[in-house]
Amino acid sequence: MALILNIDAREIIDSRGNPTVEVDVLLDDGSFGRAAVPSGASTGVHEAHELRDGGERYQGKGVLNAVKNVIEDIDEELMGVEADDQRLIDQLMRDLDGTENKSKLGANAILGVSMAVARAAAESADLPLFRYVGGPNAHVLPVPMMNILNGGAHADSGVDVQEFMIAPIGAETFSEALRVGAEVYHTLKKVIKDKGLSTGLGDEGGFAPSVDSTKAALDLIVEAIEKAGFKVGEDVALALDVASSEFFKDGKYHFEGGEHTAEEMAKVYEDLIEEYPIVSIEDPLQEDDWEGYTALTAKIGDKVQLVGDDFFVTNPQRLAKGIEEKAANALLVKVNQIGTLTETFDAVELAHRNGYRSMMSHRSGETEDTTIADLAVALNCGQIKTGAPARSERVAKYNQLLRIEEILGDAAVYAGRSAFPRFTK
């Protein structure tokens, strides 16, 4: 296999105008890989450390130190290593960093290299990235969990739930699912506009109208689905990212004007899934409420997918604890939460081995990088969350999945309802 010849890096900006790290990897056979690192708005306290410069430049969010770490330290460490030995490469970087949360070199530095090396190795092998990572069995296209209405930390809409998503589960192909999602999205804009509400967009391309409750937001989406000509729950299901750690203060959930316990929030969710065809709820409880998660999973885990984002932070150790305690039943996969590809692979493998579902995910601060689209297919996630069908940094991932579906041809399978076997008819 080709050897790593040179690693370079630079500071670029993401979709929110904040700096991030982009890495170039050149192999000795001329193969080249480039990757850019995403960044989140609502971040879990247990995530790998994103190294920022501080100071006045870019209001403290510069990443020149992370870039320097790639160019001066990581490049020297990985020079001459075989590019297809991803596990060794990631381990060498973790050893070089020497901290549990990658705070010395920065997870943004390490991840940029990890992804760029994989891209270069795929090019050297003359394979698309999804095939290089996933092998011959990578053929399942994920259900797009499209965030078409934004709240919480992603918008100034007044509603506490961070993301209201649609899942086109009734489609036959990914391309059809994307069309369904786009048609509902455009219809939602008209529904919102006709009610005299704002059609401004949040960080992830979803609309951010001023609504006063979760149910009011869901009602807008249900109306849009029906007016677009689709059946709610049959053609298109609903999903939520509550991001509850964002409104958890002083031991209580400050939700929709009240202060609630974990037990009371469980009743809120139980009522919602009875009233609406919701197949997935992400981060329903605070990220360290293990007891609450176990109780919630026992209560409604057979009726709805309960996804750990801030709860698991794509970390195999936290996921293993969740499996042991029967807390949640699905893993959200964000490569920058853990900081290397192989640790991401390990988390997804652990989830699937124990009957947990997985959902590949973007971050609110994104770039044109499409790595997660390939990984969703390579790791057989069956679900992907990468925003609304709007804003080029979101659409880039959907368009890459269209290309992958085209490459696969007759071998392509769209996950559809099978992504939620317990929760759909």
Swiss-Prot record:
The protein's annotated catalytic reaction(s) are: (2R)-2-phosphoglycerate = phosphoenolpyruvate + H2O
* Active site: residue positions: 204, 334
Q: What are the protein's GO molecular function terms?
A: magnesium ion binding; phosphopyruvate hydratase activity
Does the keyword Magnesium feature in the UniProt annotation?
A: yes
Supply the enzyme class, top level. Answer: lyase
Keywords associated with the record:
Cytoplasm, Glycolysis, Lyase, Magnesium, Metal-binding, Secreted
Q: Which cofactor does it need?
A: Mg(2+)
UniProt keyword annotation of Isomerase present: no
A GO cellular-component term linked to this record: extracellular region
InterPro entries to which the protein is assigned, alphabetical:
Enolase, Enolase-like_C_sf, Enolase-like_N, Enolase_C, Enolase_CS, Enolase_N
Record-listed (2R)-2-phosphoglycerate binding positions: 162, 334, 363-364, 385
Q: What is its EC number?
A: 4.2.1.11
> Where in the cell does this protein reside?
Cytoplasm; Secreted; Cell surface
- Disulphide bridges, residue numbers: none
List GO BP terms, alphabetically.
glycolytic process
Q: What domain of life does the native source organism fall in?
A: Bacteria
Q: Which positions bind Mg(2+)?
A: 241, 282, 309
Q: How is the cofactor bound?
A: Binds a second Mg(2+) ion via substrate during catalysis.
Q: In which pathway does it act?
A: Carbohydrate degradation; glycolysis; pyruvate from D-glyceraldehyde 3-phosphate: step 4/5
- Which family, according to UniProt? Belongs to the enolase family.
Query: Which PANTHER family does this one have?
Result: ENOLASE
Q: What is this protein called?
A: Enolase
Gene transcribed to yield this protein: eno
